[in-house]
Amino acid sequence: MFFYDSPKLPIFAGDKTCEMFVYRHKVHYYETDRMGVTHHSNYIRFMEEARVAWLDAIGASYARIEAEGVISPVIGVEGRFLHTTTFDDELEIEVCVKSMTSFKLKIGYTIRCKGEVVFEGWSLHCFLDKDGRPLAIDERYPQFREQLP
């Protein structure tokens, strides 16, 4: 079951409050390992699910961005596991823009379970044309920055 809303919350201690998008994910049995906890590799996938839902919600879906001739691959990702989660846990995945230039976008994620932070991370994306060459998003798709919360 997936659903989302958008309160304003800080993403990491010391960060400014920003428009926070919240995506919810219920942990499936197949996402757990032999020890009964959510396998660590799933957190990167949860980040992607939340990012795609967030882009859809702000009107800048990957399909729309790609129709403008822009691709945005992940060029970096990092995370910290703070607590385990298990089958049937309901996760709240908070998404927030950490920083942006014309060529890169850094997105922060905080994953909570029952109000407790269980994971913090970020993904870094660049902007390329369809031939894989760097491009300035402000020149190719200027409304993208305006759509960001």
What does each model-identified segment do?
Residues H25-Y29, F81, F127:
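Hydrophobic residues in beta-strands and at strand termini
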Residues F3-S6, F12-D56:
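Catalytic strand-loop segment that frames the active site of acyl-thioester-processing enzymes
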Residues Y43-F46, P73, G108, L124:
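Residue-level recognition of specific faces of alpha-helices
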Residues W54-M100, K104-L105, C126:
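Hydrophobic beta-strand-centered segment that forms part of the acyl-chain substrate-binding groove
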Residues F3-Y4, F12, M20-Y23, D56, ...:
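HotDog/MaoC-like acyl-thioester-processing domains
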